[in-house]
């Protein structure tokens, strides 16, 4: 966007910040709206962007909620209504006046569509008539749909990954204030301030996405605006890929994509041959093995150290951009997986484990059955106990933390060659059966992956330099901080592109039942996700995990005479890219070891940049310094004045400047620090406000701690689908009648430190049920999440599992128990 258009938009926004919306019946739709179309494939959008926001009130007993106001902003034109019928009439009017059709839509954003659409779904149609017009992540989370087939709704939250307040600050349109505790109904008189509040929220959406449209080609290219935050990074990958047109990387991957697009339903000239069908079916089996072999970052919190306070001896070492480091420096399976020899004896098995002989220079997927599995150290398990990796097992026991496999009489699973080697590092096995092995040629990732990482790093570095300058000059604003965080998360989202699950649930909206219904699992057989293969994501996670496990051994598990780690108790916490350990003294040699590793990593990164720099600058026209990736993969070392953990992702720290920080998974972080005036301020949850001293705050972090609902910031979603009619006294003191038949109530819930929701779920089911679920290749975490399990809420669990289950076979299993 040029300077002139940016300035004109800023002045226009400044003049509209205090507007009062027009009642929908009095609104005159501008005739200029009907001019022009935006084309993309077979879709067309009117060159406008709309934003829709609703305001709701909750019944005193929290049994139901209702909408009392809606506002729709279309560019600088804002209207409002009071009822769902008003909204339906306004939508019909827009469709008729603008001549909206299935192929000529209005693009409309809703922030947190999961909430708003729960109130609208019985009033308007949400189904799509074409493929891709309805997209949902779960049965309740719709991220894209077509309202009455002509207004395309997109969830703003999954794109921006920011609260609406932050979006407003980013475009210099801060949200207004409103008392949400007051009860209002559609008949309650509203002040101009009430109307402005809702109008501002809708207006923020239109202005924010106008600026995003400018990034992706302007108002005439609305289809180019990505749907999600991950898709934004995918766009960057796609750009770098197409910039490599004509290179060997480009030709090789396009051929691979063309092969993956083969589908059994093709007929006539496009019908696949018998040999192609055999390869296709084999690839489907390999995809199942890949999904089974994938699991995320390694997490470890020593149970024997839980609740202990460590002063001035705890050091945290964090890997900067661990996943990007793996993509740049490690090798990956570059082509199709083919059958490989199965080891016939122990000597061949050892060769395969070390990547020698017949298996040299091949990335391997190994289907293995282990008998008599036992962890070498009770606290340091390696295999997670709740993932879909487990195909079959017998008498499986978990370690003290409940997160890792301690032992198993029999365990059948699929592993990458990287994880297979680590298996023997952390476990003893009485008998090993190798059932199947497939392999792919090892090699480094294509140049466009490196280019994407360097481009994202360059943008992040520019923002970082600017924010540091402003911080020194004390001119940094919250808007500057937000923009820096956006650039940081873009780099983190690159990993999300690599590990996007190729098999997902297909959801459709039923306009008769007003529910999202499962239509079974569907497999993405094309490499359409930003020209990244799923197998690369499996190995990215494996390499990052391998480095973390290696660091744990180096820092806290020295090898015994046989070369196996013996945990000395000094490593007390680890999570994905972070290791925390206790010092052995002021001159602990492990600190120097980490700095030495940093020097080696920096030399490696310097060579990567220098090798690619000339071509990168010639292709993209972006100058980059030699030390662009200087920090990538290096250890960021920090020593704490005080450290304490009570479980995985549950810990508190005190810095040497007196800053107290507390992290509890699922809750906003607490961050207590002194401002420029010497006063202590907090960003995050308020639970620790009641404790005056730092020592008291640290002491309050306890195993089994309970945080009241008014301080936990946890909101439990409770949906209702039945008709509620009630009389309530509104904020004006008048008795009003309210009728509502669908919606969502956000009920505050307390936090209790205890076993995870997944462990709760598994504890309520018999072991054979868990085994049957894992046989289906279904991620047990996703089952628990889909079941709607919340802290302190396991009522009617089995019924909710059936309602939100990901697979019809899963429903049948649960019905039997």
Feature map (PLM): residue ranges:
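Conserved Walker A/P-loop ATP-binding site and its immediately adjacent core
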Residues: 113-115
């Amino acid at each position: 966007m040029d300077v002139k258009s940016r300035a004109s938009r800023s002045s226009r926004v400044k003049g509209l910040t205090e507007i009062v919306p027009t009642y929908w019946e009095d609104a005159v739709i501008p005739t200029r709206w009907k001019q022009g179309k935006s084309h993309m494939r077979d879709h067309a959008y009117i060159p406008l962007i709309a934003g829709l926001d609703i305001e709701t009130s909750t019944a005193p007993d929290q049994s139901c909620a209702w909408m009392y106001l809606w506002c729709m902003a279309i560019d600088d034109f804002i209207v409002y209504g009071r009822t769902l019928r008003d909204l339906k009439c306004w939508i019909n009017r827009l469709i008729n006046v603008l001549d909206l059709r299935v192929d000529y839509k209005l693009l409309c954003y809703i922030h947190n569509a999961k909430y708003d659409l729960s109130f609208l779904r019985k009033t308007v149609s949400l189904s799509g008539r074409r493929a891709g017009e309805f997209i949902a992540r779960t049965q309740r989370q719709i991220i894209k749909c077509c309202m009455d087939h002509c207004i395309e709704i997109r969830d703003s939250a999954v794109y921006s990954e920011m609260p609406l307040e932050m979006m407003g600050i980013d475009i210099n349109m801060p949200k207004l204030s409103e008392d949400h505790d007051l009860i209002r109904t559609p008949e309650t008189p509203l002040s101009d301030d009430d109307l402005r509040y809702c109008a501002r929220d809708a207006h923020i959406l239109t202005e924010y996405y106008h600026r995003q449209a400018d990034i992706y080609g302007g108002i005439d290219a609305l289809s180019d605006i990505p749907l999600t935050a991950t898709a934004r990074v995918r766009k960057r990958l796609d750009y770098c890929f197409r910039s490599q047109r004509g290179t060997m990387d480009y030709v090789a991957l396009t051929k691979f994509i063309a092969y993956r697009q083969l589908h059994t339903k093709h007929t006539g000239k496009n019908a696949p041959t018998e040999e192609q069908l055999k390869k296709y079916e084999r690839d489907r089996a390999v995809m199942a093995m890949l999904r089974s072999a994938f699991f995320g970052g390694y997490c470890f919190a020593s149970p024997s150290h839980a609740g202990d306070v460590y002063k001035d001896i705890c050091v945290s070492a964090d890997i900067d951009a661990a996943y990007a480091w793996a993509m740049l420096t490690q090798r990956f399976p570059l082509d199709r997986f083919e059958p490989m020899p199965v080891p016939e004896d122990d000597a061949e098995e050892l060769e395969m484990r070390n990547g020698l002989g017949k298996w040299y220079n091949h990335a391997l997927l190994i289907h293995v059955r282990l008998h008599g599995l036992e962890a070498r150290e009770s606290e340091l398990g390696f295999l997670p106990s709740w993932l879909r990796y487990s195909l079959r097992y017998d008498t499986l026991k978990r370690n003290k933390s409940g997160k890792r496999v301690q032992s198993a009489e029999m365990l059948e699973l699929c592993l990458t060659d990287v994880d297979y080697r680590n298996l023997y590092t952390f476990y003893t096995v009485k008998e090993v059966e190798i059932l199947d092995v497939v392999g792919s040629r090892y090699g480094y990732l294509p140049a466009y992956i490196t280019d994407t990482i360097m481009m994202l790093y360059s943008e992040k570095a520019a923002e970082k330099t600017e924010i540091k300058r402003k911080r020194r000059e004390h001119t940094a604003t919250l808007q500057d901080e937000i923009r820096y965080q956006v650039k940081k998360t873009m780099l983190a989202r690159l990993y999300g592109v690599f590990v996007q699950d190729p098999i997902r649930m297909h959801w459709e909206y039923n306009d008769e039942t007003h529910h999202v219904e499962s239509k079974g699992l569907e497999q993405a057989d094309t490499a359409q996700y930003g020209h990244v293969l799923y197998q690369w994501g499996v190995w990215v996670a494996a390499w990052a995990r391998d480095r973390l496990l290696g660091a744990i051994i180096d820092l806290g598990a020295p090898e015994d005479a046989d070369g196996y780690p013996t945990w000395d108790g000094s490593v007390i916490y680890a999570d994905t890219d972070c290791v925390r350990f206790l010092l052995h003294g002021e001159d602990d040699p492990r600190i120097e070891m980490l700095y030495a590793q940093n020097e080696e990593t920096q030399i490696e990164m310097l060579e990567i940049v220098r090798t690619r720099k000339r071509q990168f600058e010639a292709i993209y026209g972006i100058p980059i310094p030699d030390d662009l990736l200087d920090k990538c993969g290096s250890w960021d070392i920090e020593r704490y004045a005080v450290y304490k953990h009570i479980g995985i992702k549950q810990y508190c720290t005190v810095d040497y400047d007196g800053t107290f920080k507390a992290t509890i998974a699922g809750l906003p972080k607490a961050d207590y620090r002194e401002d420029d005036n010497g006063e202590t301020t907090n960003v995050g949850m308020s639970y620790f406000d009641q404790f005056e001293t730092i020592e008291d705050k640290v002491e309050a972090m306890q195993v089994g701690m309970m945080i009241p609902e008014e301080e936990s910031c946890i909101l439990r979603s409770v949906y209702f689908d039945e008709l509620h009619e009630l009389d309530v006294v509104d904020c004006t003191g008048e008795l009003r009648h309210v009728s509502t038949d669908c919606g969502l109530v956000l009920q505050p819930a307390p936090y209790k430190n205890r076993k995870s929701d997944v462990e709760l779920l598994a504890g309520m089911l018999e072991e054979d049920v868990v085994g049957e679920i894992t046989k289906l290749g279904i991620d047990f975490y996703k089952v628990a999440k889909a079941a709607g399990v919340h802290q302190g809420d396991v009522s009617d669990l089995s019924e909710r599992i059936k309602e939100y289950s990901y697979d019809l076979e899963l429903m049948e299993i649960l019905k039997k128990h």
